[in-house]
């Protein structure tokens, strides 16, 4: 990648948390990848790879892309899924793939997806907050949610 394209960074996480990542292609929004390691200083034992934003040159598991809508993700998963409501630090995350294709793409490997809603779309109170929602709920579909983050993570030995 070249030294100028692999930079340690600290990014904002949920609830005011600061997260150490290694950014690959940090200045190129279409190719940027954020990688975490068990030891960020030594960059050993890969724990996650994340793409986020509106567009990316990278494609996630099963053909998953940033910008995909709920219906597309259901098709890729092979079934509906459960996600959290919007408007809070953990809002829009898929919380249960319901045993679909994106549930576990390889032993010990998880796919995490976060949806967002466009700023110009008025979201109903029904899709806000911490409560779980089915991807099939009419209010979720009406919100025009799109994938804004895809993360692939690997469980560590102590998590098995």
Predicted regions, residues:
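Non-cytosolic coordination micro-motifs
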Residues: 1-15, 48, 53-160
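A glycine-rich, hydrophobic loop/mini-helix early in the fold
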Residues: 11-53
